[in-house]
Amino acid sequence: MSDLINAIDLLVQSTDCVVEYGSGESTVLLAEKGCTVISVETSWNYFLKITERLEGPIVKGRVHCIYADVGTVDQWGSPVDTSPRAAFLRYPLQPWVQIERRELTPRLVVLDGRFRLACFVTSFMKAPLGALILINNFYSRTDYHLINHFAQESERVGDLAVFEVTEKGRNMLDTDLMLSFSSSFLNPL
C-alpha cells in the first residue's frame, strides 16, 4: 500500500469533506469511507477513467471531479507546453470555488497532482484552521521544502508529509514569502 493511501486511511476519520489535487485510488478510498470529495484532475483520459469508475452506488453524489484543462499533458498529467498559463493559475483555485459554492468545510487536503506548491499555498490560505494538508513525495522533492518557511510538519508517513493549517503559519506567509512562491503557480511539479 502506498504512503498516500496509508496516510489517508489513518487521517480520514477526522473529516467528512476532502479537497484532492490529482485523482486516483485515493479518490475511490475517500468516497468508500463516506467522504465528500472535491477532486481536480489535469489528464482528460484519467479524468474519464476515474469518473467512470466512480459511477457506482457507493460513491454516487459524494465525489465531484473537476477536469482542469491545462493543455496537452503527459502520462502523469503534467503539461507538456507552457502556453496555457492562465489555466495554470486557475488550477489551484478550482476545487475551492466548488467548496464555497457547495458551502462545504474540508478538514483534509490531499496534494498528489500538479502545481503542488501553488496548491499548498492556496489550500493553506483557504482551508479552515486545524485542517490537515497531505503532500505526497514531499521529502524526495526538495523544491517542496519552501513550505517549511511557514508551515510546520505535524506527521510523516514515508515520503509524505502532513501539515496543519495554523494562524501562526498564515501570519508567516507574508508578502515577500508569497512573492517567492509566485512562480510555483506556473510550475507543474
Please state what every model-predicted region is.
Residues 8, 50, 92, 147, ...:
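Generic structural signal of hydrophobic/aromatic residues within well-ordered alpha-helices
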Residues 3-7, 24-26, 93-99, 120-122, ...:
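A generic local structural motif
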Residues 2-75, 141:
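SAM cofactor-binding core of SAM-dependent methyltransferases
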Residues 1-5, 9-10, 166-174:
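General structural signal for secondary-structure boundaries
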Residues 51, 76-80, 147:
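Short aromatic-enriched loop/helix-cap "lid" or pocket-rim segments at secondary-structure transitions
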